[in-house]
């Protein structure tokens, strides 16, 4: 059985921001519990990147709009015969609940911005080697605390992101499942089509091909060019089958 590789590409700025936030939040949990300097720097660098993303746009506002939009889309399915009404209602309640929690939550990332340790580490991250023990004695002593003490602090930091994480996960799941994968064929490594107001492209390639897609475009139209991983000796077949979902 061929191994399939999934690629996702945003077709607008809000989706680009959401995918970056999702990626960074996932990265925060990868190396837990934090037991050494390398794990700590990975964690704090992702916290810093996440706060930078928060400062660039109205994340909460866009998410609340999307939660409402998804509720309207579900409402349109209520009158369709054969639809699982219980499932529709359960999803609507989840969307409503996530919106209520998000709108009543403090400013996204505020607890992280106000934390002294996070602020100190953020100041040094842009300096090559700037997180040595003599630069950041606060981090050095923090890493020598009892593991349970560090774990509790990290748990508190991550919990402050829960309103965002829950809403974002729900929205992205609905968007990703809004369109099925369909078989498509590229000619000489190129494929283009209309976006039909899609937010996200999802593309499946077999690993055997050792190709990757370069995607450009927006919600109205997009183009995909397939490139060989080995730029010197790799070949792109004249016809390449792949699976594509426009979500």
From Swiss-Prot:
Matches recorded under InterPro entries: ZapD, ZapD_C, ZapD_sf
A Pfam family this chain is assigned to: ZapD
The UniProt record lists the keyword ATP-binding: no
Location relative to the cell: Cytoplasm
Keywords tagged on the record: Cell cycle, Cell division, Cytoplasm, Septation
The keyword Cell cycle appears for this protein: yes
Cellular component annotations (GO), alphabetically ordered: cell division site; cytoplasm
Main location per the UniProt record: cytoplasm
Example GO biological process: FtsZ-dependent cytokinesis
Similarity comment: family membership: Belongs to the ZapD family.
Cited function: Cell division factor that enhances FtsZ-ring assembly. Directly interacts with FtsZ and promotes bundling of FtsZ protofilaments, with a reduction in FtsZ GTPase activity.
Quaternary structure annotation from Swiss-Prot or TrEMBL: Interacts with FtsZ.
Name this polypeptide is given: Cell division protein ZapD
């Amino acid at each position: 059985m061929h191994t399939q590789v999934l690629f996702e590409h945003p077709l607008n700025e809000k989706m680009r921001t959401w995918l970056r936030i999702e990626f960074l939040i996932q990265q925060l949990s990868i190396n837990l519990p934090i037991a050494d300097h390398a794990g700590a720097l990975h964690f704090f660098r992702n916290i810093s990147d996440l706060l930078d993303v928060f400062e660039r746009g109205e994340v909460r506002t866009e998410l609340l709009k999307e939660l409402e939009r998804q509720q309207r889309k579900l409402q349109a399915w209520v009158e369709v015969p054969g639809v699982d009404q219980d499932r529709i209602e359960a999803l609507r309640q989840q969307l409503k609940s996530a919106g209520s929690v998000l709108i009543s939550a403090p400013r996204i990332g505020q607890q992280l911005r106000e934390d002294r340790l996070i602020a100190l580490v953020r100041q040094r991250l842009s300096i090559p080697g700037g997180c040595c023990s003599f630069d950041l004695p606060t981090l050095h002593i923090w890493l020598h605390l009892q593991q349970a003490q560090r774990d509790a602090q990290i748990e508190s930091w991550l919990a402050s992101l829960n309103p965002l994480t829950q809403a974002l996960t729900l929205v992205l799941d609905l968007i990703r499942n809004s369109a099925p994968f369909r078989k498509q064929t590229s000619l000489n490594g190129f494929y283009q089509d209309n976006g039909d107001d899609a937010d996200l492209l999802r593309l499946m390639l077999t690993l055997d091909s050792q190709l990757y897609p370069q995607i450009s475009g927006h919600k109205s139209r997009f183009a995909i060019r397939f490139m060989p991983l080995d730029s010197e000796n790799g070949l792109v077949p004249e016809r390449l089958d792949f699976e594509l979902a426009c979500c």
